[in-house]
């Protein structure tokens, strides 16, 4: 028959074994949780890195400051960065004159242009630098700089890409580029992708990726609501504000 002291020692040993087993089980579960959390963190980091890949795109710029440097635009095609933002006018090659009295149209989103010449002309707004291009067998001019005091303020770097956007943003999925080239906004697209598809819009306040933007879209207006950085609702026919 066991003595009381022996019983006490056995009970204490069993209790200690239970505690050790519980601690070991808890530690194993903790290790698994930490391993899973680390895996999830790595996956999120990959997702964020992919989502933020646009931040690492650095388009080349020409930084023109006079007529001679602006003629670099002739050396390669250009693509319109901000669709439906810049007015172009009819140009008479024989008379080397621009009809500033009538708008000929707006440059479309990612429209590809071949600039044939760059020159200084007089306009109702003072002297301007214009870029000459052809479209539908007609010749047009679009202002790329305005004279301020004795110098010209150039904004052509804000108007044009001088590299193919398809190469600059080649990390975008093929289905995204298919929609962009078709000038369509689809659920899941980012604001920049929508801008490339249908031009610049007017936001209803809010912060990028968490707001509604109204796009004139060259006379085919639509509104797009973004959440979490992606388009979640597209409403055709909504008037741009």
Question: Where do the language-model regions lie?
Answer:
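N-terminal Lys/Arg-rich, disordered targeting/topogenic segments
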Residues: 1-8
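Hydrophobic membrane-insertion alpha-helices, especially the h-region
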Residues: 11-28
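Hydrophobic single-pass membrane-insertion segments
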Residues: 25-37
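A cross-family detector of function-defining hotspots
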Residues: 29-32, 120-126, 170, 174-241
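SH3-family beta-barrel domains
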Residues: 38-97, 158-160
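A short macromolecule-binding patch
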Residues: 71-73, 78-79, 136-148, 223-226
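Conserved beta-strand/loop element in small beta-rich adapter and peptidoglycan-binding domains
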Residues: 98-121
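Boundary regions of SH3-family modules and the immediately adjacent low-complexity/disordered segments
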Residues: 133-169
